[in-house]
Design a protein with these regions (language model features):
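Structured helix-beta-strand junction loops
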Residues: 50-51, 93-94, 137
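Active-site neighborhoods of enzymes that stabilize oxyanions during catalysis
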Residues: 139-142
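Second-shell loop/turn segments in exported
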Residues: 29-34, 76, 102-104, 121
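Flexible, polar/low-complexity N-terminal or interdomain linker segments that lie immediately upstream
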Residues: 2-65
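Catalytic cysteine-centered active loop of the rhodanese-like fold, especially the PTP/DSP P-loop
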Residues: 85-134
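N-terminal, post-signal-peptide region of Sec/Tat-exported proteins
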Residues: 49-87
Length: 142
């Protein structure tokens, strides 16, 4: 009986660990987005200084708490503001657009970068580290 109980507990522990590992991995944004260029904070700052459009796809509360100056806010979870028409109206297809959100645990910027690439934008930049890295670097915020 003890052997069966021990085996059952071991199986349950392994299953729990695998479930947690899968969840943790799923909650991490990808390192790259096909068709987009991944940039770090310094590269994002240079793009900002060069006049690139910054697209913030975070929740409205996060946006209101602070964002990159002159960034466009389109809450990805709100279909009234985040849709293909809104994305197409952002810029010409050959203008630089930087997609960002709340860092590596935020999937919104990756999904937004994917959408921009699918819509035919040619200069899509994926700022994976997002607003936290920008803020930590001491760059301007609004």
């Amino acid at each position: 009986m003890k052997t069966v109980l021990k085996s059952t507990l071991q199986t349950a522990l392994v299953a729990s660990a695998l479930t947690f590992a899968t969840w943790a991995q799923a909650a991490t944004s990808p390192l790259t987005v096909p068709g987009a260029t991944t940039v770090n904070a310094a590269e994002a700052k240079q793009l900002w200084e060069d006049g690139a459009i910054f697209l913030d796809s975070r929740k409205t509360a996060d946006w209101e708490a602070g964002h990159i100056p002159e960034a466009v806010h389109l809450d990805r979870k709100n279909p009234d503001v985040y849709n293909s028409d809104a994305l197409n109206d952002l810029a010409a297809k050959d203008e630089a657009i930087v997609s960002y959100c709340n860092g590596e645990r935020c999937l919104r910027s990756a999904k937004t970068a994917e959408d921009l690439v699918k819509l035919g934008f040619k200069k899509v930049y994926y700022f994976r580290d997002g607003f936290p890295a920008w803020n930590d670097a001491g760059f301007p915020i609004e």
